[in-house]
Amino acid sequence: MGYGAGRDKYEPAATSEQGGKKKKGKGKGKEKDMDELKKEVTMEDHKLSLDELHRKFGTDMQRGLTTARAAEILARDGPNALTPPPTTPEWVKFCRQLFGGFSMLLWIGAILCFLAYGIQAAMEEEPQNDNLYLGVVLSAVVIITGCFSYYQEAKSSKIMESFKNMVPQQALVIRSGEKLSINAEEVVLGDLVEVKGGDRIPADLRVISSHGCKVDNSSLTGESEPQTRSPDFTNENPLETRNIAFFSTNCVEGTARGIVVNTGDRTVMGRIATLASGLDGGRTPIAIEIEHFIHIITGVAVFLGVSFFILSLILQYTWLEAVIFLIGIIVANVPEGLLATVTVCLTLTAKRMARKNCLVKNLEAVETLGSTSTICSDKTGTLTQNRMTVAHMWFDNQIHEADTTENQSGASFDKSSPTWTALSRVAGLCNRAVFQAGQENTPILKRDVAGDASESALLKCIELCCGSVRDMREKNHKVAEIPFNSTNKYQLSVHKNANPSESRYILVMKGAPERILDRCTSIILQGKEQPLDEELKDAFQNAYLELGGLGERVLGFCHLALPDDQFPDGFQFDTEEVNFPTENLCFVGLISMIDPPRAAVPDAVGKCRSAGIKVIMVTGDHPITAKAIAKGVGIISEGNETVEDIAARLNIPVNQVNPRDAKACVIHGTDLKDMTEEQIDDILRHHTEIVFARTSPQQKLIIVEGCQRQGAIVAVTGDGVNDSPALKKADIGIAMGIAGSDVSKQAADMILLDDNFASIVTGVEEGRLIFDNLKKSIAYTLTSNIPEITPFLIFIIANIPLPLGTVTILCIDLGTDMVPAISLAYEQAESDIMKRQPRNPKTDKLVNERLISMAYGQIGMIQALGGFFTYFVILAENGFLPWTLLGIRVNWDDRWTNDVEDSYGQQWTYEQRKIVEFTCHTSFFISIVVVQWADLIICKTRRNSVFQQGMKNKILIFGLFEETALAAFLSYCPGMDVALRMYPLKPTWWFCAFPYSLIIFIYDEVRKLIIRRSPGGWVEKESYY
């Protein structure tokens, strides 16, 4: 689109809101403002005559405002700048990480631990420090992971900051008859401003005089061609009329004078920026999922805690003991390691995506992309290459195809015809575009050009086919030129002819094909000039319609050899009082151009379709062009017709076709303006392939909201300022890193560093993968909760010595389980990842009943059995047989009782009993590690067999070894008996849990086999999470 990095110098981007999306005040006033902004731009200034303008603004059309008056207005209206969006102070961002969602659960756990320790300290003379340790560790976990997440987002913010090139803008104003260059912020309402090619328009201007002035409106309206600006009132719609130049667009060529009619936030651009910053972005799907998950876990924890609190009172424990149990059970239910796991998983994916050219601004957006069900994509630069390229030529009465591929591997045409020589000469000479200096070694297609998009395309095409255009221009020196203007719609130049066998001067002309043809009486065929008859005019008309129907921009070319007798050497050509012929010329041919699709896009759109994602094109461009590109990239697939296509095929009027018969539809912005919400919903519901053309920024927003009403999770791509409201409103906004404006980058959640649509599909795959892998990590982490909680419950109910201590639970959650849980984030995708429909956020949750039933009810129970088996084996080896343990707890824990008898009549002192108890804690811990081996392996897949998936995940294999080594270290390292009360085990005790590990593996393989054999059956419904 625009002209490279020179765009967007001073958008409200100096301060920006990274991280979470902004929340909207609930006030009615805010909603009213939003509705105001959603309306189309209203403006009357373009309809006023110069006298009325003078009366309204008090501006002298020659001398401008007086300096004193300008100062008054500046004091009244404030500076001409956009209000920066409210920013979040760094400390607030940090607190959000520390106290958001999951962290709160751990904070509550920590407070409960300190509370329990306080109660124990008040009750006992020598209280155990377990709860104190636990509280400290939990607090540390939250603080460390909070710092980690904050650092991650701060890093993205830094990259964002580097996008901003804040250069103070200058403007040329006329005040009291003198030209002054002032800071653009000091421009006021009614100022007389002068702009020239290369300037940024400093405010909304009503043009009062112009000379060949063209502006690049692409960042505002999405039109890729520069638009002419003149004093004429040409359209009721202020965005379409020629006499208004908009703030922050670029003047590409020519000069103009205008009166400032809006400044700062009141400009059209300012309204859009306000619209974007005022929108409520909403919570990300993953944030909603994690909240849902916290609800489940908290629910389970509180339910168990309260149940056992009541039970312990019934079993005649004291109130204080019951409170300690309540707190213990709630804390044991909290998966301490999960917060870190989720953060690390999202970070890893964000890093992986950055390598694939997707910069993720806030971590949660990674997953949102995976649940996307609709992508509203901009056309220019995202689906297309963002460079006009010659696509076809028509000469010698036939259409030739040019090569539009990025690496020139496509079609070639016959370059030997003398007509092509003539056509290429006209296209090269009647052309003001030039290559910028110092690019001799750059490939021709990659070179930067000074000139408008169409001329650049011609220049590159001729340079590729015929060699140096510069040499051609030097040989055929230009002696006169009439630049293109909107009234006569042609560009003409006269050159000295380098060919001695032809006339001394040659006139070359290009322009709108029908205008050029009207000026011609002859045509070149096979190098010979022939009269232009009706048959050839029909052939021209057919070719013109065919190329135009492909959505291409067509130009006509003609020339005339000026006779030597009338135009001797040194003849003075006058371009004002034209003293040379501009009629009866000789037509040479047509050349058509298009911004061609990127090579990887059709494949990417196909992938989206098989992944159940609907791709909608939303563009400011012409409907015919939009439809042609949509067909080219597969957004409208082969064989699918629009209402117009059906009408043409059946030869009936469009209004007789039933819209439901057409799968595809192309909707014009002006039609969209008059539609009700119901009509928009109807279109989105009944058409699978949709293109919106000639849309305004406000309409883009309406389209996004329409999709969201259908329950879709919407991703929006865009690069212009005009896209920012939609980017903000969408579930995930994707801005372009190269062509994108600062406002759009700021509104987006993700930035495509290579501007390529295909990168989005990679992102979708990564997003789905992270969701799958998070599920696997959570399933793995939650499973060990059961063998951690059940010992506590049995301890209360059966009055046996405590099988597993608090410190050992921490060693599992924050020690042995951490690396394996994170390693699941590296798991490769299962085969169906891009073949299934997008997940439904309402029904397909991150943690659902089936996952809880698998983790808690099935695998977790087997694990608990393994732990208790080990516990009973060790106690039995020490003389306490299982049935003698019932009800022994009170004596066992009494430090003054030193004569507790075992099954063989031996007496045990308090110290000896405790050593056996702590050895049991260690063995229970080791047995959980052993059964978690199997759990980790079965969590690798949800449907495939582990044998199909293979053990390619090196991190996971490392995780298996790491957790085993850590467990052995904690058990055998000298000094652990004092620090963590962990004691060395006999080697045979490691093997007690092996059979249970095997049972878990076999049980799950059989379950997955049944799911694969009978898809949709009972087992899948009950256990496929």
UniProtKB/Swiss-Prot annotation:
Q: Where does ATP bind?
A: 489
Q: Where is the composition biased (Basic and acidic residues)?
A: 1-11, 28-37
The scientific name of the source species is: Xenopus laevis (African clawed frog)
The subunit structure is: The sodium/potassium-transporting ATPase is composed of a catalytic alpha subunit, an auxiliary non-catalytic beta subunit and an additional regulatory subunit.
- Keywords per UniProt: ATP-binding, Cell membrane, Ion transport, Magnesium, Membrane, Metal-binding, Nucleotide-binding, Phosphoprotein, Potassium, Potassium transport, Sodium, Sodium transport, Sodium/potassium transport, Translocase, Transmembrane, Transmembrane helix, Transport
Top EC category:
translocase
Q: Which positions does UniProt annotate for Mg(2+) binding? A: 719, 723
Topology Cytoplasmic: residue spans: 1-89, 155-290, 341-774, 826-845, 941-953, 1009-1025
What EC number(s) does the entry state?
7.2.2.13
User: What gene name is listed for this protein?
Assistant: atp1a1
Protein name (Swiss-Prot/TrEMBL): Sodium/potassium-transporting ATPase subunit alpha-1
**Similarity comment: family membership:** Belongs to the cation transport ATPase (P-type) (TC 3.A.3) family. Type IIC subfamily.
